[in-house]
Amino acid sequence: SFFLIPINQLNAQSLDSIKTENVTFKSEGVSLAGIIYIPKKPQAAVVIVHGSDQVPRMIKFAELLSKNNILVLTYDKRGVGESDGVYAGPEVGTNNISRDNLNLLAKDASAAVNTIHKENKNLPIGLVGFSQAGWIIPIAANKNKLIEFMVLFSAPTVTTLEQLRFQFYTDGRTDFWENHT
């Protein structure tokens, strides 16, 4: 299904009128920490899914969405910030883009969706993310039927194997971008 909320058509509200709730939820035995932004009249709900970097919850993006009547859960990636677990880094050659890691991160996103669903069962729920989330979000959406839509920014257009080959090829080559752009 397709769901679109034109932000310019919504009545933006001040951040002061948005309720926030710190949450922790479990995924595969690990406790993940985040915050839910709850506008007065939410039209939809989203979970923000991380890219590959070691980044905590995305507060500014969550605030922007919530000011436009979207309920948002943003959480610290596993092993980052207040979340437990082990972070698998984006360095070349790590298991960051392995099938096991991407499925694990998809389970984390799915657990976040289940947490939002408990907050408000009547809203359409989606996932929004950047970069590596372009692999994670479709996996989660395929396995969790509560997910009704996906928004992907700067998402990968190649397989993880092709991405890994590219990383190995360009790693340490300071002249790569000068010669190939």
Task: Briefly describe each language-model feature range.
Residues 151-181:
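Accessory cap/linker subdomain of secreted extracellular hydrolases
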Residues 65-89:
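Conserved alpha/beta-hydrolase
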Residues 95-118:
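Alpha/beta-hydrolase active-site loop
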Residues 134-144:
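Short glycine-enriched nucleophile-adjacent loop
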Residues 51-63, 77:
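The serine-hydrolase catalytic nucleophile loop
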Residues 120-131:
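Alpha/beta-hydrolase fold nucleophile elbow
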Residues 13-39:
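N-terminal cap/lid segment of alpha/beta-hydrolase-fold proteins
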Residues 43-51:
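Short beta-strand element of the alpha/beta-hydrolase
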